[in-house]
Amino acid sequence: MHLSPQEKDKLLIVTAALLAERRLQRGLKLNHPEAVAWLSFLVLEGARDGKNVADLMQEGSTWLSRDQVMEGIPELVDEVQIEAVFPDGTKLVTLHDPIR
């Protein structure tokens, strides 16, 4: 199997996001890489499900709360940008202050 660098990046995001999901289910707080991976994964999956950029940007601030991440993480993650594939092409989705 030959994967492009972009495909490898997406697989790494999915792996980290699945770990983050398991930790959230166990009641653990996410660190910086886990929080970013989780948010990125939800954008990628939302695009795959047919949601549009505006909806994902709006929903993005509801996916993680301050109580679900380690201290100081909301301030570190002031913006998350991820390129996602939509039915009409690849678009950049930006989540502003996604952890509230």
From Swiss-Prot:
Keywords: Cytoplasm, Hydrolase. One of its GO terms (cellular component) is cytoplasm. Its EC number is 3.5.1.5. Gene3D superfamilies: Urease, gamma-like subunit. One of its GO terms (molecular function) is nickel cation binding. It is an enzyme of class 3 (hydrolase). Its main location: cytoplasm. It is found in: Cytoplasm. It catalyses: urea + 2 H2O + H(+) = hydrogencarbonate + 2 NH4(+). GO terms for biological process: urea catabolic process. It comes from the Bacteria. Pathway: Nitrogen metabolism; urea degradation; CO(2) and NH(3) from urea (urease route): step 1/1. Heterotrimer of UreA (gamma), UreB (beta) and UreC (alpha) subunits. Three heterotrimers associate to form the active enzyme. HAMAP family: Urease_gamma (MF_00739). Belongs to the urease gamma subunit family. This is Urease subunit gamma. It comes from Synechococcus sp. (strain CC9311).
